[in-house]
Amino acid sequence: MSMEDPFFVVKGEVQKAVNTAQGLFQRWTELLQGPSAATREEIDWTTNELRNNLRSIEWDLEDLDETISIVEANPRKFNLDATELSIRKAFITSTRQIVRDMKDQMSASSVQALAERKNRQALLGDSSSQSWNAGVADRYGRLDRELQLANSHFIEEQQAQQQLIVEQQDEQLELVSGSIGVLKNMSQRIGGELEEQAVMLDDFSHELESTQSRLDNVMKKLAKVSHMTSDRRQWCAIAILFAVLVVVLILFLVL
């Protein structure tokens, strides 16, 4: 959650580069179609800067394509659904179309002819370059102000988007923290109940041992009483037999 998605970092750089390229393209169009004369240096500089920006944007878009391919190969690892992938693909497609449109207009035959004519006019007008310097400085200053304004708007949008992402992450962290608290309370209750049951089992074990000891004592006493009773019965039987023997002897003597 705390790690920033690299796609949004590259996306921000691409959007910033597109804004710069659009400003250069507008200036390049004004130089070719405007009624005022422009020097060859200004036309060449604007053209080269525009082409370099477009080439850099294309490279960044290729990097974004590679990141999407990696995510599509293992979507579970990056936790991105199909909707988010579609949004990212749409951004790449639309940006690539913007770059393609500007390149097509720059490479059009009519535009090339206009650029060559402007270059010839610039070469013919180099003798009056001193009177043009003030106008060039003003145009460059206006272009810089426009670029700075576009960049400031872009930075504000990115900051607002990052703030929204941070707020969403904070909300998710609060939900996770609440769930952890509930689980902690449940685990504490379960632990208390287990401890109570352990105490009850320990008491029951002691009672069982005491009962077993008392039962053993009773069994020993019963065995002792049984042994004593058996001895008494034997003496009684001997006495009866002796009495019978005496009676028989008396009868024998009498008869």
Swiss-Prot record:
Where can this protein be found?
Golgi apparatus membrane; Golgi apparatus, trans-Golgi network membrane; Recycling endosome membrane
Pfam families, per this entry?
A: SNARE, STX6_10_61_N
Query: Would the keyword rRNA-binding turn up in this protein's UniProt record?
Result: no
N-acetylserine occurs at 2
Q: Where in this chain does the record put each t-SNARE coiled-coil homology domain? A: 163-225
Q: Which PROSITE patterns match?
A: SYNTAXIN, T_SNARE
Q: Where are the transmembrane segments?
A: 235-255
What SUPFAM superfamilies does this protein's entry cite? SNARE fusion complex (SSF58038), t-snare proteins (SSF47661)
Modification Phosphoserine, positions: 2, 129, 152
Spell out which residues lie on the membrane's Cytoplasmic side: 2-234
One Gene Ontology cellular component term attached to this UniProt record is:
trans-Golgi network membrane
GO BP field: endocytic recycling; endosome organization; Golgi vesicle transport; intracellular protein transport; regulation of protein localization; retrograde transport, endosome to Golgi; vesicle fusion
Q: How does it sit in the membrane?
A: Single-pass type IV membrane protein
InterPro entries listed in its UniProt record: SNARE, Syntaxin-6/10/61_N, Syntaxin/epimorphin_CS, T_SNARE_dom
The chain's coiled-coil residues are 41-74
GO molecular-function annotation terms? SNAP receptor activity; syntaxin binding
The UniProt keyword set, sorted, is: Acetylation, Coiled coil, Endosome, Golgi apparatus, Membrane, Phosphoprotein, Protein transport, Transmembrane, Transmembrane helix, Transport
Record carries keyword Nucleotide-binding: no
Q: Region (Required for interaction with VPS51): which ranges? A: 2-168
According to its UniProt entry, the function of this protein is described as: SNARE promoting movement of transport vesicles to target membranes. Targets endosomes to the trans-Golgi network, and may therefore function in retrograde trafficking. Together with SNARE STX12, promotes movement of vesicles from endosomes to the cell membrane, and may therefore function in the endocytic recycling pathway.
Subunit architecture: Identified in a complex containing STX6, STX12 and VAMP4. This complex also includes VTI1A. Binds EEA1. Interacts with VPS45A and GOPC. Interacts with MARCHF2; the interaction promotes MARCHF2-mediated ubiquitination and degradation of CFTR. Interacts with MARCHF3. Interacts with BLTP3B (via C-terminal coiled-coil domain). Interacts with BAIAP3; this interaction is increased in the presence of calcium. Interacts with VPS13B.
Q: Family assignment? A: Belongs to the syntaxin family.
The identity of this protein, by name, is: Syntaxin-6
